[in-house]
């Protein structure tokens, strides 16, 4: 049955005691202690009957960490426990456990030394700390710093907002970070680390798996020992994504570089942008892709697709299992294919071949590299036939091209070469060797021929026209007319000579420029009304082998180079605008010879007279030197007045001598020219007036070859002649196309093909094909069969007989014995060759046909060779042809038209100009020659539009002369001449004029040197005189007073510098060092850049200065530094000479010899010298303010800092201990007091790590180990002692802030709170019910006893009967009654023998070993009355008891309320529970539910936000997936597609871009996709597939 009881406080035992329900009790009053007692009572009611409520000491306290009065909702249980009271119950906190502190609002600190700082935070476990608002720290030494953070596990730390750290030593440092597992770390925002020692150290990083590492932002590492870099993803054990933006998926996969992807176990992507997908594959090159198990792509931009595929060459592609692309830019297609060579495509290997079928028509153009099929080759053959013209066609039976027929005036020809050979004989041809047209004519031994009827060519600087004989005759007449009056103008002759030399060189060089004759006729240009020598790509060309033309007034013959060379040579030796004098070259030669002699005689002495200025001008004469000697080369320009020296004149004379020789040669050449022109006509290309064409007939031959024809341009607009080699090449190409040993002989004869079918030979394609048809007539199935109707093999196939392509045809052998089929690429090559041969803009079309050429003949267009050749034959009317009647031997005639009038030959290239040249000369050459002559003459001579030269004008002494002779005569009168009698017979130039001395002006500055013999002019002499005058003044200024008396009195020297050496032996100063300066008697500056000033001064170190007599600078300043220090011997001044460049020392004395530096201004900069005044002021300042904020004023003994790293401040202060500090008068730190600090006058520290502060303070015990501290059960340790006084004098420590931590000092305010609490507790204890139990009976007994004592002890009502010891009342107001009774405590009562009262305000009726009953106690009524047993029994009757077991013993584990009848019972006035096993009241439950609801609501809101964000991100991801799913892809084989797509889902949107490609055979499909969504996230996908 149940026992009824109740729990009351027992002050004697200091705990709650179970008693009868009838027992009376008084409440324990202290702040919230009533609630606490109620809780304990409730807890007692829930515990077994008779147990003591010993859950812990009730030493907790409420603390208001804010301001104002305390609330009443706090709970603090445990010694040192503290709970913040706050202002109201809603903010109260709970602290349960030893030194537990619940500081934050709503906070809970449960466990020893737990500390809940944040609002609504929870700290569970030894030393757990929850500092962040609403944070949770669960586990020993766990720590939650961030707001809403959770730290679960020993030493776990959640430092960031909303962070979670779960696991031993786990650490979530960033906001929203999660660290789950032993020693995991999530360092920055949004980072996640899951697994033993996982580490996510950067923002948004994720490390999932044991020892996984996500070391950079946005890194994801999933799997044991994975690693991921910035924006990288590593999935799979030991997967490593080390490159930025890389991805590694699969066991041991490695993405080592930027933007790499490695997917598959052991896959490796080792270079930037590389992709490796498959088992054990490797992408080792930049931008490489390896797809397939064991595949490898090692080169730049390589792709390896397929098992064990290998792409090693840069930009190579290996597609198919075991395929290998080793060459650069190579492609290996198909399994086992090998591409070893650069820039190749392989579809097999040396033993495995594949066909390429279904080839579409390839583009056929100059830059096309498409494959060609059979139909295209046939189309090209047909096109060739059409372009050949002349009736050529494709044989419908055998596909060959029939020979063309070209009908020419000289017969029909069946190939282009033969037709061109006929045309070659009588046209003016290009000499390819000489690079010009050749007028040579004849077949066996062609000779030079005259070109007649040449119209006057334009004569200008830009003219390329041929000039005729009459034009050259006019030029020669001008030369003859200008010959007589050649004068002796030295300067002009010098210029003329130089130009002649240049002209001669140019003429000589022109001889070597003769080229080969081009294979084109010289044709009439209707637009320009002249023959045009344009050739090939050049607009102008030379005409060579031109026979000397007839040089008469009415001649229209073309002149050759030798004729013009003769003329030019004559012109070169004569000057222009010479008065009409001589009629023949012989006279000219005589005059030039006379001129040479005159110039030679005049040149020796010709210093010329300037009559306007009345002076000689210094133009120099000949080669010898005189008084005006070694004259520097004068400026040889038009305006120059410089004198010329002998070497310059020598050059001129040599040139004149050369001119004389050239003139004689030219005379001969001109004479020979007439004869040559007379004999020119024999070999010219003649005009056949009967047939209206130029004819190549020569001599007795009716037909002659025109050789040396350069390859003519073969285009639609070309009118070039075609030579034999071109025709031979064309025939050879056609023969090559025929095959069957078809060939072209060296004479152009075409040998037909021979085709062997079986054992029979066939000599044309038709018969050969017919034989082939017979051999296949019995073939069946899919064979290529002969179509008898069509007369050819038919590629028709299938029931409908559709035309089919014959594909995969390998390159057929091209040789005279080959019978291989050729493929499209070969046909394209043939077509290209044919197009090149045809020229005329012919092109190979995309379908293999050839676009017809266009040949322009006489401004008409022709689209085939036959028509073009016919046109050329017809247009020979406009060709430059051979005229057999011209001259004695015939000549090419430029006569044209019905009346055969002379015509201009235009576009004539520059002919060679030499003695042996027979080239035609064009107008520009003649103009150039005349221009050279005009330039050589000077005097503003110019070439007129008709080729003549205007006369020059020479101004000499202000008179004008129009020819060289008159000019030289004018010079002779006024020249500065050589006087052989002057200079004592040694000879000299004489400047006298008209017998009077004259000035020589315009003399250039002569060279002034020791070996110069140049004349100097007035300006130079004036400058010298001025310099002498200046130097005289400077010398006077420097020397000062040079009077002997002055020097004797003041010393020798210069202005302002004097030395008096009277009585001293001469001993000069010595500056021995480089850059050194020594001033003063016997001064020595030995060091480089050193200075010694003063008698006997000496400086022997570099840059040193010895200033003053006998001063010595010999010490080198070394770089170094030291600190200022204080020793027992005084202060050691520090220095630092390392902060700049060190120069030599300045010495003003010597060792043992000193000087004062007086009158020194106060220094102002860091390195200025200071004066005594400054030093005195500084010392004074040190005495008063030695250091800012530090002052000392004492005359006592100095301080001593003896210990290492010690500090001593204050008079007589001594610090002997290492690292000690002593501050104040007489402060002392003992040598044994390591780290001791003594602050204050006579403060002493004699213990390690101890501190004494204040006057006379002394440490007494120092550090202690395992000492017994007051009110502490466990032994304690200290590191040192802090003393603020001594045994003889103590100090108050005032203004102490309230302590909060376990080891903080507490102030009186805190102690008062404690005292108040103690007072309340004392009062409560005094009034407790259990202290007055049975008190009435006890008092009655006491009264009776007192009465007995009196009665027996002379007091009526008080008697004693004892011989024991006296009672002792020791406490104030105490009472001791009975033998040996002791009332030790204040206000205590010891009643009865041996009774002991040791507690204040108590009554004791016994001792701890001898107790007494208090009987006959009346029932208590008041709150402080004692209760008797009857009352207790009555109280117990309504109390709650523990249940009993079957054996009758108490069942402490069960309590049944309500009598066990099935009803319920309400327990009212239940105090709030504080311990784990305490019952909670409705208020606590309601508050807990509210807080749980609030926390749950908050977390749900947060979770909802996270879910909302997650939902948004997921929706964005789904939208991205939808956008990428919606991307269309290429589907046609060989096609590629770039696509864009969009997607939206649940309010989020995304856009995607994609690129896809289908392989040429349609089997492989590649896709690369990327997307971005409205959440700002990016995604990418890569795929490849094969279909069959």
UniProtKB/Swiss-Prot annotation:
Induction: Expression is negatively regulated by H-NS.
Pfam families reported for this sequence: ESPR (PF13018), YadA_anchor (PF03895), YadA_head (PF05658), YadA_stalk (PF05662)
Keywords from the named record: Cell outer membrane, Membrane, Protein transport, Signal, Transmembrane, Transmembrane beta strand, Transport
Gene Ontology annotations for the cellular component aspect, listed alphabetically: cell outer membrane; cell surface
Domain of life: Bacteria
Region (Surface exposed passenger domain): 54-1499
Domain topic, free-text comment: The signal peptide, cleaved at the inner membrane, guides the autotransporter protein to the periplasmic space. Then, insertion of the C-terminal translocator domain in the outer membrane forms a hydrophilic pore for the translocation of the passenger domain to the bacterial cell surface.
Protein name (Swiss-Prot/TrEMBL): Autotransporter adhesin EhaG
Lineage per the UniProt record: Bacteria, Pseudomonadati, Pseudomonadota, Gammaproteobacteria, Enterobacterales
